[in-house]
Structure formats: structure tokens, C-alpha cells
A protein has these predicted regions:
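Conserved alpha-helical scaffold segments that buttress catalytic/binding sites
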Residues: 1-268
Length: 268
């Protein structure tokens, strides 16, 4: 009875690429997200069962999966990091489904720049699960050493600037100016803790395009379920709700790519 997923394909033959971007230069609270990709991959290799009870099948039978890591990424400036992520993402775009593993949320901007260069961004909705809106123009308002337009708190503003539609799920911590920007531009925000939890189907119906890019910042999940993050916020999505939401999105939309970011492994 084997456990763990296998990554035994070459990158040139893979139709699933796990792109690891260990970066946390602009993290505004606790550090550690640079260790996130390695921890996730380690768990995938040695901890998870090969039988998936949600689908009743072995995950992605017939898929050829490969790992790719951007080495020494944490030495880069935010601008250089985004360029490196974009270049690597472009290599496999169109060949494989790419799951980007952060690292802090700023790594997502590189993936979105690659997508926007290849497809019409206005036909794609970036669906973000996140406690925060990440709509700041830069990080100068809260950082003593600001990192500019490519900080982790700016990723959805960069998505907007690139022409993507955006949808925010699990929001419960934001600046007044961020929410004003969202309302001014008609961005769809599903706040948590301000009323009843929305049905997953209602969120899917609110996605205005057939194609989505999924960005999962794990601080969007209730820290009672996901404590291993640098910016935990009380409340958030419950684990099984999150699984159901993702399942509904994959069943009803074309997912152009996805990322999981802001995992900061705890020293158990």
C-alpha cells in the first residue's frame, strides 16, 4: 500500500509542473514562507495517501508530474524575483498545468505576468482566497524598508493593473483605502465574519469569466485549521468548506493555473 505522490517525469515531458518559489523578502510579519515549498513537497512525497477519498480515485492517473525549483530566489530583489518566476512559468505554460508554490504572495505576480502575455487577461478571473485584499499600490504605508510595487500586499493590485478580473474570498483584514478601491472599481469581495458564510455555489456564480486562476493564500483559511502562516487572522474558511469550494470551481470553470502561498512551516 504505497503512500506519497511521485514526481518522476522530466520537465520536458511533464503535463503537471510543481514550480517552487521559495521567497519571503517582503513578508511584513513573521518570516518562514521561503521554507514553504520544500515542506509542501516533502508532505506530498511522504505523507499523503495515493487514494483520494474526495474523488474516489488515485489523484490524476496518467499524469506526468515534475518538480522545478527556482534556486537562490530569496537573494533576489522583488523585481528580479518576479522576472525569474515569469521566465520559468512561461517555459511550461501551454505544455502543463502549473501549480506554483510559495513563498510569499508576491511570487504570484510573476505567474500572472506570464499568463497576461499569452492570453487576454480580461477573460480570466483571479480568484483569491486570502484574509487580506492585497490591493495596496505598494507597501510604503506599513514597512520601514518598503519594497515597492512587488510586495506581497500588492499582488491583487498588480493583477488588476494587468487587466485581470479579480474576486476575493475570505476577506477580513484590510485598509480602508483598499476596500474603497475595490468598491470604486466594482471588485467582488466575499467578506468573512460580517454575515452568513456564502454558499460555494454563490461564489462560483459570481465569477464573471469561464477561465480562472486560483491563488490560495493559506491565511485565508481559519488558523485553527491552518496555523502555519506568517500573517494569521482569526476566523476564515473552514477546511472542508475550502475543499468543497475548490471542487466546485474545478467542476464549473476552466482553471488556467493555481498557486498556494504564504505557508510558513512551524517547528514542531
Amino acid at each position: 500500500m504505497p503512500t506519497g505522490l511521485k514526481f518522476n517525469s522530466s520537465l520536458s515531458e511533464a503535463n503537471v509542473v510543481i514550480l517552487c518559489a521559495p521567497y519571503d523578502r517582503t513578508a511584513s510579519y513573521l518570516k518562514g514562507t521561503a521554507r514553504g515549498p520544500a515542506a509542501i513537497v516533502d508532505a506530498l512525497k511522504y505523507q499523503v495517501e495515493t487514494w483520494d477519498r474526495y474523488t474516489g480515485a488515485i489523484p490524476s492517473p496518467g499524469r506526468k508530474a515534475a518538480l522545478c525549483e527556482l534556486t537562490k530566489l530569496n537573494r533576489c530583489s522583488p523585481e528580479t524575483m518576479v522576472k525569474r518566476v515569469r521566465r520559468e512559468y512561461e517555459k511550461y505554460l501551454g505544455q502543463a498545468f502549473i501549480l506554483l508554490l510559495g513563498g510569499e504572495h508576491s511570487v504570484t505576480t510573476g505567474a500572472l505576468e506570464a499568463l497576461a502575455a499569452r492570453q487576454d487577461a480580461k477573460n480570466i478571473t483571479v480568484c483569491q482566497v486570502d484574509a487580506h485584499l492585497d490591493l495596496r499600490p505598494d507597501d510604503s504605508d506599513y514597512s520601514d524598508s518598503p519594497h515597492g510595487a512587488y510586495a506581497h500586499s500588492t499582488v491583487m493590485r498588480r493583477a488588476f493593473d494587468l487587466g485581470f478580473k479579480t474576486l476575493h474570498i475570505g476577506t477580513r483584514a484590510y485598509a480602508k483605502e483598499e476596500m474603497s478601491f475595490a468598491r470604486e472599481h466594482g471588485l467582488k469581495v466575499f467578506e468573512w465574519g460580517s454575515g452568513p458564510v456564502p454558499a460555494a455555489g454563490d461564489i462560483v456564480k459570481a465569477i464573471a469569466t469561464d477561465t480562472v486562476y486560483l491563488s490560495i493564500d493559506v491565511d485565508g483559511i481559519d488558523p485553527a485549521h491552518m496555523p502555519a502562516t506568517g500573517t494569521p487572522v482569526q476566523g476564515g474558511l473552514e477546511w472542508y468548506y475550502t475543499i468543497g469550494l475548490l471542487k466546485s470551481i474545478f467542476e464549473n470553470k476552466k482553471v488556467a493555473g493555481a498557486d498556494i502561498v504564504e505557508v510558513a512551516p512551524r517547528p514542531y
